[in-house]
Amino acid sequence: MAALPARAVLVDIEGTTTDVRFVHDTLFSVARRDLAAYVSAHAGGPEVEAARRAVARERGESEQAVSDGELAAALLAWIDQDRKETTLKALQGKIWRSAYESGGLRSHVYADVEPALRRWRDLGVTLAVFSSGSVEAQQLLFRHTTSGDLTGLFTAFFDTTTGPKREAGAYQRIAEALGLQPGEVLFLSDIVAELDAAAAAGMRTVQLLRPGTARDAESRHAVAERFDDIAP
């Protein structure tokens, strides 16, 4: 079994706590369906205008040159590309909030996750989340699970405003925010490049091999198929 550090566990979401298919087939579908209407209804709002600036910057154009229709089309293309663009993630979070709060959307969390998180928390381990989805989207996902509200299990949530998930600096900043040394934090993810970045920052790492995730023969990270394979 993979060793658990005494102080903190930092978890990824997609492919780690949650089935990749829920993110791509359900959440992304909701975002695609509702994005154009949201952009039109909230033009001038902070999330829409931040996204407009990002699209304009990429095109080398002024914000005024990007119409609502062009903005929606560009953002839909980014969703299809699975772009980890912070402004897109913030906008998606707003769209998902409406879907969750209407009662029409419940998030998937693997059955082994909640018991393990509760066990680790009861042992005094700090729990935190690091995902490319916005903090708002993370909290919505864990608040509206089929098992109920799990947000109270976590001390902190981090998104790409902290830094890209494949850069060591982001993990160093997270450790600092938690008041810990990187070596006191265990990062759980299904993505080797993210684990490499966390390890470069000094964190301990375990790769989750959920269904559909293949083990990388060149990876040096410990592996586990379930959270209950990770023993304190």
From Swiss-Prot:
Gene3D superfamilies: 1.10.720.60, HAD superfamily/HAD-like (3.40.50.1000)
GO biological process annotation, one example: L-methionine salvage from methylthioadenosine
CDD domains the UniProt entry points to: HAD_EP
This protein's UniProt keywords: Amino-acid biosynthesis, Hydrolase, Magnesium, Metal-binding, Methionine biosynthesis
Pathway(s) it belongs to: Amino-acid biosynthesis; L-methionine biosynthesis via salvage pathway; L-methionine from S-methyl-5-thio-alpha-D-ribose 1-phosphate: step 3/6; Amino-acid biosynthesis; L-methionine biosynthesis via salvage pathway; L-methionine from S-methyl-5-thio-alpha-D-ribose 1-phosphate: step 4/6
UniProt entry tagged with the keyword Transmembrane: no
Protein origin, superkingdom: Bacteria
Free-text remark on how the cofactor is bound: Binds 1 Mg(2+) ion per subunit.
Cofactor(s) this protein cannot do without: Mg(2+)
Gene Ontology terms for molecular function: 2,3-diketo-5-methylthiopentyl-1-phosphate enolase activity; 2-hydroxy-3-keto-5-methylthiopentenyl-1-phosphate phosphatase activity; acireductone synthase activity; magnesium ion binding
Catalytic reaction annotation: 5-methylsulfanyl-2,3-dioxopentyl phosphate + H2O = 1,2-dihydroxy-5-(methylsulfanyl)pent-1-en-3-one + phosphate
Known EC number: 3.1.3.77
SUPFAM superfamilies xref list: HAD-like
Functional summary from the UniProt entry: Bifunctional enzyme that catalyzes the enolization of 2,3-diketo-5-methylthiopentyl-1-phosphate (DK-MTP-1-P) into the intermediate 2-hydroxy-3-keto-5-methylthiopentenyl-1-phosphate (HK-MTPenyl-1-P), which is then dephosphorylated to form the acireductone 1,2-dihydroxy-3-keto-5-methylthiopentene (DHK-MTPene).
Similarity section: Belongs to the HAD-like hydrolase superfamily. MasA/MtnC family.
Oligomeric form and interacting partners: Monomer.
Protein name: Enolase-phosphatase E1
Gene name of the encoded protein: mtnC
